[in-house]
């Protein structure tokens, strides 16, 4: 006698199927295991088989799942590509390949889950690094991405959720792209439920924020710090739009999280041989950091920033991160 069909959590992973990633209306059954021991499924809509690791960094992986998890963990603990290669005894090209796959996977999950974040107090700041070489060593025919690289980051103050980032030259376009990502991932504020935004004195933010939010829905303040001989001598807090409380105008939270980036990612260290050689590796490291910070790292009360914002209802682990499939 045929038993009752068990719950199937995965959706069809065949991109040409009309039920690709679609939960409602799917018709999938388990169909044994492949020679590597991975669960195999059959989609009755497209009539094609797929395994549980398809569309994840573990698909067609020659390394064991535990090894791939170790690569991901080491990448977030200030270890360089060659350092991970020495520790795990795999070629650096293998480490780079998995690092790229994990970065793409993290970007997909970030784009899918970080949505409709409620309005609140948000802080923006920039963090400096460089690609391949510093500005003072640039040659006229070097690629545009070489030299100084600034990462614009946006965090929510109460939960510590990293909402958006963008990396590039320190120009208004780089800031604008980050703010557009931020705008798409936030709920629209209302006059009765304003969004409060705080930055340093960089005028790039104010120029773009005026295009995204109306004055009645936004409180925006800047904190301007003056230094003499590298010592802080004066802090000025200014209202730019709306009516934010003067004492709440601060960027201490985002500065703290940017410091966490420097502590966790070796390529952000100021004097290092682990600097990024290409922009794609730089962005991959930030995508992984964003997901790990939001979904895996505990913030307070045994909850992650994503749990505090009700983006997820549980604490993710590394295995779940690498094996997860999104559902539409």
Label the model's feature ranges.
Residues 1-328:
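Residue-level recognition of single "structural anchor" positions
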């Amino acid at each position: 006698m045929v038993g009752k069909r068990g719950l199937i959590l995965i959706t069809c992973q065949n991109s040409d199927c009309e039920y690709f990633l679609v939960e409602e209306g799917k018709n999938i059954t388990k169909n044994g295991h492949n020679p590597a021991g991975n669960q195999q499924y059959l989609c009755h809509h497209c009539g094609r088989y797929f395994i549980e690791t398809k569309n994840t960094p573990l698909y067609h992986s020659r390394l064991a799942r535990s090894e791939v998890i170790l690569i991901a963990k080491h990448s977030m603990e200030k270890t360089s590509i060659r350092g991970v290669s020495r520790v795990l005894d795999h070629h650096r090209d293998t480490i780079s390949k998995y690092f790229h796959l994990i970065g793409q996977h993290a970007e997909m999950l970030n784009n899918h889950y970080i949505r409709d974040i409620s309005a609140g107090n948000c802080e923006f700041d920039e963090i400096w690094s460089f690609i391949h070489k510093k500005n003072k060593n640039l040659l006229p025919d070097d690629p545009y991405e070489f030299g100084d690289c600034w990462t614009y980051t946006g965090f929510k103050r109460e939960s510590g959720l990293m909402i958006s980032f963008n990396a590039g030259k320190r120009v208004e376009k780089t800031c604008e792209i980050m703010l557009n990502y931020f705008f798409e991932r936030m709920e629209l504020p209302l006059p009765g439920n304003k969004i409060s935004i705080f930055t340093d004195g960089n005028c790039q933010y104010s120029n773009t924020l005026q295009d995204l939010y109306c004055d009645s829905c936004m409180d925006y303040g800047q904190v301007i710090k003056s230094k003499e001989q590298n010592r802080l001598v004066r802090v000025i807090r200014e209202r730019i739009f709306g009516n934010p409380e003067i004492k709440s105008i601060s960027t201490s939270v985002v500065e703290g999280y940017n410091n966490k980036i420097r502590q966790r990612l070796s390529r952000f260290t100021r004097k290092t041989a682990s600097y990024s050689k290409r922009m794609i590796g730089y962005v991959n490291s930030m995508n992984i950091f964003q997901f790990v910070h939001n979904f895996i790292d505990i913030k307070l009360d045994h909850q992650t920033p994503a749990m505090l914002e009700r983006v997820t209802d549980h604490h993710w682990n590394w295995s779940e991160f690498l094996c997860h499939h999104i559902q539409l």
